[in-house]
């Protein structure tokens, strides 16, 4: 697991040295960031999510929305002026004061009227009845690479490697998709995802340590990155993410895996002020070439009752691979995987 720490090397400027200043800075930047995101019709999406108890889970609603109604791309050039790549670290530092919101961690943009659309970028399979107009949805696009991984593109080895992973995932589909050999698609994708997860977690860890040293100059924040990386990779696979094939895991067994991950999160819900816990599962039907995106959710009700904490597994999206472009399938796969990594990192980094 040893990696060159320069892989994630970035130039960070100190923002605040005290919790008070950090909170003030956070509130100011978050307000401006929220103005940027006001065009997102998430309230309209949430109002149609069933069952209603999930409508307050911002990250779940955001994942549904992006998988089903947003143009997913690998690069955005037109919204760099309001670009806060370190928002995720600020939220982690203030974990007891803020609710982490995925919409702050990805770069979104309005698509201008009349702008040429690349059909390969379209991800408008609407399995969620959101009630948002198709026209309005088509005017939104999002970069699947989180802000924290893409803000130093010209110098970032990690960013270049992410683009290589996009090509590798597509190459697998190009090679085995026409033959409908989805068993080999799974075998290759599974290996790619494993190394991809480690790459992104390592990148986040190096940047997190640099950020912590700048914002907490009087604290001891040095971490043994290989050890912490190993711990996060284990937690990611145990609690937050799974990718299973139909030939060794039935859909019922897949559901059980996600419910078991929910069970591991129950103590966290009781221990910390969180109303929801989220995990991510991919299931590939290797006979028919169908990729199912699914979330496991633990929800704590406000009312104190014997059924206060509930565990659910909910489908988020479905793709028949041969009916969609390789580009579209890979972008959705990678966005979903990125979301699982961010969920793991933001939940666990302060415990490492």
UniProtKB/Swiss-Prot annotation:
Any GO molecular function: telomeric DNA binding
Keyword Nucleus set for record: yes
GO biological process, one term: meiotic attachment of telomere to nuclear envelope
Description of what induces expression: During meiosis.
Localization, UniProt: Nucleus; Chromosome, Telomere
GO CC terms, sorted: chromosome, telomeric region; meiotic spindle pole body; nucleus
Keyword Nucleus in record: yes
Assigned keywords, A-Z: Chromosome, Meiosis, Nucleus, Telomere
Predominant place of localization: nucleus
Purpose: Required for telomeric clustering (bouquet stage) during meiosis 1 prophase, formation and efficient homolog pairing, meiosis 1 disjunction, and telomere deletion during meiosis. Also promotes meiotic recombination.
Subunit organization: Interacts with MPS3.
Protein name: Non-disjunction protein 1
Native source species: Saccharomyces cerevisiae (strain ATCC 204508 / S288c)
